[in-house]
Amino acid sequence: MDVTRLLLATLLVFLCFFTAYSHPPPEEKLRDDRSLRSNSSVNLLDFPSVSIVALNKKSKQTSRKEAEKKRSSKKEASMKKVARPRTPLSAPCVATRDSCKPPAPACCDPCASCQCRFFRSACSCRVLSLNC
């Protein structure tokens, strides 16, 4: 009986010390900015100051105009690029990424080969090696 009480007492003391040392100490309250600057680990003067500026109506309108100019120039550039019509291939072959399900002819590109998926239900000519 005395041994169990001794073990329980030491366990209680251990738990008291453990709970006391596991909690962090209360932080000191800083009274002014000077003590804050001296105690801080990061120097606040190292970072550049940030200024927030509100846009007025004129600057908003100019930015809209610039955006419209960019959009119109992109549209003009896309209109200038006219898609060239593909010339029909004279040889009996299958173009790259077209269906080549057997008994279709071979692929036109010498680096391409007919690759089938889903139990040979979907076949297409694909270029497998880039170094060809």
Curated annotation (Swiss-Prot):
One Gene Ontology term of the molecular function aspect: melanocortin receptor binding
Biological function: Involved in the regulation of melanogenesis. The binding of ASP to MC1R precludes alpha-MSH initiated signaling and thus blocks production of cAMP, leading to a down-regulation of eumelanogenesis (brown/black pigment) and thus increasing synthesis of pheomelanin (yellow/red pigment).
Annotated localization: Secreted
Native organism: Macaca assamensis
Comp. bias intervals (Basic and acidic residues): 63-79
Disulfide bonds: 93-108, 100-114, 107-125, 111-132, 116-123
Swiss-Prot/TrEMBL domain comment: The presence of a 'disulfide through disulfide knot' structurally defines this protein as a knottin.
Designated name of the protein: Agouti-signaling protein
